[in-house]
Every structure is written in C-alpha cells, then in structure tokens.
Design a protein with these regions (language model features):
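Conserved G/P- and acidic residue-centered "switch" motifs that form tight phosphate/ATP-binding loops
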Residues: 113
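The feature captures the ABC ATPase H-loop/switch
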Residues: 116
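N-terminal beta1-alpha1 cap of cysteine-dependent amidohydrolase-like domains
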Residues: 1-110, 120-123, 128
Length: 130
C-alpha cells in the first residue's frame, strides 16, 4: 500500500548563533508516520524555494505545527508590540496562502498550537498577544 504524503511545515531556528536551520519536532514526524501511517515530507518555510501549487499536488494533507515564533500582527491588521515576541515572517509567507489554498480546494490539514493560530489568521481572524 502506498502511504499518503503528508507535508509538515518547518520552523526556522538558529544553532550556535550563526547556523540557520529548518526543523520539525520528531514527535510530529512520528505522529504522521506511525499514527496516521503517512509518509512525512518536511516542508521548509522558505518562500523563495517552495511553490504552493506543487506542494498541494504532491501532498495528500498537511500538518501546521507549533513553534516559538508568532504570526506577525501585520497579517491580521495590528502593529507589533513587545508582547508579541519573536516572528517567523518566512513561515507566515508559506503557511497563510497555503492554508487558504487548501480550504479552497477542500484538502485536509491539521493545525497545532501556532498552526491553529495560522488557520485562524488565514481565515480572517485575529490574535491576542500574551
């Protein structure tokens, strides 16, 4: 049986203050592979390297994971404040239009923590900083 390909959106991290990486938590990869019986595909949150139409055609579904960085308040009509914390603008540029395209197409996805906030913002909602 061919396992469905499930895209997992990566988070941007800096290692040793200089080395930028795209990463996904092992627990998310294990959940896709073992629980959902899918083939995990780690999707870098790098807008210049990722084409949303290609992703949608290749993946049966997506997982939008949690992460330290928050959705930038500009995405829901607010100005950033210190309460918002750090941001990952590249991830915003991938996830928000991807979610909108998935909803339009009726393709399945799951949002966890930040991922659920991305779904909310992509659908026109706002967030409260804490």
């Amino acid at each position: 049986m061919v396992r469905p390909i499930i895209g997992i959106i990566s988070n941007h991290h800096i290692i040793s203050e200089t080395y930028a990486v795209q990463a996904v938590g092992s627990i998310n990869v294990s959940a896709v592979a073992e629980v959902a019986q899918g083939l995990p595909l780690l999707v870098p949150a790098l807008p210049d390297m990722v084409r949303i139409p290609d992703l949608i055609d290749q993946c049966a579904g997506f997982v939008f994971t949690g992460g330290r960085a928050n959705v930038h308040p500009q995405e829901y009509g607010e100005k950033p404040t210190p309460a918002h914390g750090e941001f990952d603008r590249d991830r915003d540029r991938i996830t928000l239009p991807l979610i909108q395209a998935l909803v339009e197409r009726g393709q399945p996805f799951l949002g966890i923590c930040r991922g659920f906030q991305e779904v909310n913002v992509a659908m026109g909602g706002t967030l409260y900083p804490e």
